[in-house]
Curated annotation (Swiss-Prot):
This is GTP cyclohydrolase 1. PANTHER family: GTP CYCLOHYDROLASE 1, GTP CYCLOHYDROLASE I. Keywords: GTP-binding, Hydrolase, Metal-binding, Nucleotide-binding, One-carbon metabolism, Zinc. One of its GO terms (cellular component) is cytoplasm. It comes from Blochmanniella pennsylvanica (strain BPEN). One of its GO terms (molecular function) is GTP binding. Pfam families: GTP_cyclohydroI. Gene3D superfamilies: 1.10.286.10, 3.30.1130.10. Belongs to the GTP cyclohydrolase I family. SUPFAM superfamilies: Tetrahydrobiopterin biosynthesis enzymes-like. HAMAP family: FolE.
Length: 221
């Protein structure tokens, strides 16, 4: 069993208390066994699609999918993969908005297991803590590597940053294209979905909120 970092535990517990964790169940199965079982199930699915698993192009497809699920696109379900984060005391007393724009995300819609992708803008105003800028990107990537709802993904990143930074002053905006809308069903190739979460001064202070909204508009042009 993997030992989780203090930061991973803090975030996991915060999400659980707020009812924002993915609908997980406890399975005491190691990754090797998980991959083997997923491979077997994928083999059955491919077979039921009348595809020849002995063909060169399909021979290793079930194994590839199992490896991809566990090690890549759903790796965020395992908190042992939570990014290593050093919480830095705000000794420089930074009190201005810090913004990271244009963070690319690729996630998987949990309704159809089809990709959605887009861009994220995140701002925060430090109080006691700051973190390295790249850690914000890594937190975004961690939570995107799950079967997701965009609404939940937004809230998970938002609360994770509030928890680690020990401040309510966090804002997040996600603009994404959902391929369950684009590639099936209504086949709408041009619509996007936006979600926003505002906390602290971003919610209560009009000027702070407008500065964040300006950052979003700048990113989208």
């Amino acid at each position: 069993m993997s030992i989780l970092t203090q930061e991973a535990l803090l975030v996991r517990d915060a999400l659980s208390v707020r009812g924002l964790e993915n609908p997980l169940i406890e399975l005491n199965i190691n990754h090797k066994i998980r991959k083997r079982r997923i491979e077997n199930h994928m083999r059955a699915i491919v077979h039921l699609l009348n595809l020849d698993l002995e063909h060169d192009s399909l021979l290793n497809t079930p194994k590839r999918i199992a490896k991809m699920y566990i090690e890549e696109i759903f790796s965020g379900l395992d908190y042992s993969n939570f990014p290593k984060i050093a919480i830095i005391q705000n000794t420089m007393q930074i009190n201005e908005m810090i913004t990271v724009r244009g963070i690319n995300i690729t996630s998987t819609c949990e309704h159809h297991f089809i990709v959605f992708n887009g861009k994220v803008t995140i701002s925060y105003i430090p109080e006691k803590n700051v973190i390295g800028l790249s850690k914000i990107n890594r937190i975004v990537q961690f939570f995107s590597k799950r079967p997701q709802l965009q609404e939940r993904l937004t809230k998970q990143i938002f609360l994770a940053l509030q928890t680690l930074l020990n401040t309510d002053n966090v804002a997040i905006f996600i603009d994404a294209v959902h391929y369950c809308v684009k590639a099936r069903g209504i086949h709408d190739v041009s619509s996007t979905t936006t979600t926003t979460a505002l906390g602290g001064l971003f919610e209560s202070n009009t000027n702070t909120r407008e500065e964040f909204l300006h950052a979003i508009m700048y990113c989208n042009h």
